[in-house]
């Protein structure tokens, strides 16, 4: 009989240890990524119970969330940040876990480090105490964000108890127009399906648009699956995947790589694969997209007006009014021209070398608008090194951007890079929740790195296509 299982179900079945009472499955986790924020309590649980790390060779630690991106001298000025750093250093030393520390050129944002080191591979199960672990699904792995108690479970047993989600195939046909990026694609999908649209599902992204994407673009898409409510998102491995992994430090070598590549490609969902749901979007219709509200589904194309309140259900209107009020915007207002105070290029969503190249192409020969603070924060030390080798740092600095060290930076309010008061930030990150970027009244507009660069130069939301 022909195997019609999609990739998700193949990988799930391969890693299933046993069925648990209550319907969950105990899954073996092939790669466990940890960082300084969600791991200390997990290691404390191990110490309290006299447990060890079951497979330290399947665990990688890095530091990213709380580290400053300007002055990185130890001890950090922030006492809590220094405490977290000291804790992960001690925990990794005591339990034999590999750590890419701040003085290691391999350090960076956890979801950028795993792929660039060749640790992330097709067919894996991957977990991390971080919401955006679904990034790794770009390689044809199934990757889950987990909580602290689950981090402890994996450290101790290398397994995780999970309920199997349904699988939805999201096909995007056609071809993206110039000035439309991977970030626009995922924002468009979330806008159409909603922040709860993926609850109970894993998303398989398929179609011509994803086939043409680079691995870095695919990572951007999979990264934000969680923002649409999905448990994870993935793209089937193909030759683009294989070519990206080959030669990376932790990738298989020689004949082992050839065997691995053949197996990776065999995992792809067959053409007649079974899915619980299928949805199709036309990539030709996707515009540069900007969020206007307080969740990632509240977005519009650059040439659209903000929605009219009457277009929402009665139940939804209260939340929309709240978003308009918080953002100080009005229904039927153009998104184009909304003033910004800060521009942030970086994060696990858009802090890779291709993101910096796209933004630098817009910044070159131009200058940040008066009164705008603009930051470029590479996603890893290796990305930073590559960008500097290409002269991108000089382009950004000449344009008035601050060139920073690697880290999570302004994506979240756990380090010194924060908004102040009612500042509005054009951001290439992944969440626009109230207070997400540090100020309880700060406002976030999500968009692609190129669109952030365009906004920084104009001093307001603008159409990057007019600068290309």
Which positions does each model-derived feature cover?
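Fe-S-dependent hydro-lyases/dehydratases of central metabolism
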Residues: 1-468
């Amino acid at each position: 009989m022909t195997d019609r299982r999609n990739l998700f179900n193949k990988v799930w079945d391969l890693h299933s240890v046993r069925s648990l009472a209550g319907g969950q499955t105990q899954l073996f986790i092939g790669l466990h990524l940890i960082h300084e924020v969600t791991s200390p309590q997990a290691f404390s649980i191990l110490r309290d119970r006299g447990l060890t790390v079951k497979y330290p060779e399947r665990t990688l630690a890095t530091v990213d969330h709380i580290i400053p991106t300007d002055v990185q001298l130890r001890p950090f000025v922030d006492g809590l940040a220094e405490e977290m750093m000291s804790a992960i250093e001690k925990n990794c030393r005591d339990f034999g876990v590999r750590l890419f520390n701040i003085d290691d050129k391999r350090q960076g944002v956890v979801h950028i480090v795993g792929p660039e080191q060749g640790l992330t591979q097709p067919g894996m199960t991957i977990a991390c105490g971080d919401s955006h672990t679904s990034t790794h699904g770009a390689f044809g792995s199934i990757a889950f964000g987990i909580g602290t108690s689950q981090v402890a479970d994996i450290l101790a047993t290398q397994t995780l108890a999970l309920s199997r989600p349904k699988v939805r195939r999201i096909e995007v046909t056609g071809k993206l127009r110039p000035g439309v990026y991977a970030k626009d694609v995922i924002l468009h999908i979330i806008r159409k399906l909603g922040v709860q649209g993926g609850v109970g599902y894993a998303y398989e992204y398929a179609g011509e648009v994803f086939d043409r994407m680079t691995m870095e673009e695919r990572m951007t898409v999979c990264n934000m699956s969680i923002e649409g409510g999905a448990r994870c998102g993935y793209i089937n491995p193909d030759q683009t995947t294989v070519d990206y992994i080959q030669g990376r430090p932790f990738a298989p070598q020689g004949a082992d790589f050839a065997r691995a590549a053949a197996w990776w490609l065999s995992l792809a969902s067959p053409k007649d694969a079974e899915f619980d749901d299928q949805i199709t979007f036309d990539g030709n219709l996707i515009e540069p997209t900007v969020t206007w509200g307080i969740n990632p589904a509240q977005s519009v194309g650059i040439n659209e007006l903000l929605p009219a309140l009457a277009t929402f259900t009665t139940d939804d209107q209260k939340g929309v009014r709240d978003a308009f009020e918080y953002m100080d915007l009005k229904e039927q207002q153009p998104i184009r021209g909304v003033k910004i105070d800060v521009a942030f290029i970086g994060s696990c969503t858009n802090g890779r070398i291709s993101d910096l190249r796209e933004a630098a192409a817009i910044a070159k020969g131009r200058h940040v608008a008066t009164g705008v603070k603009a930051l470029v924060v590479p996603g890893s030390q290796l990305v930073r090194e590559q960008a500097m080798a290409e002269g991108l740092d000089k382009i950004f600095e000449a344009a008035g951007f601050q060139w920073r060290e690697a880290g999570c930076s302004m994506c979240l309010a756990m380090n010194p890079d924060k908004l102040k008061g009612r500042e509005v930030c054009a951001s290439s990150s992944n969440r626009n929740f109230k207070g997400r970027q540090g100020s309880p009244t700060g406002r976030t507009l999500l968009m692609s790195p190129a669109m952030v660069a365009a906004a920084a130069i104009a001093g307001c939301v603008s159409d990057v296509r007019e600068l290309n």
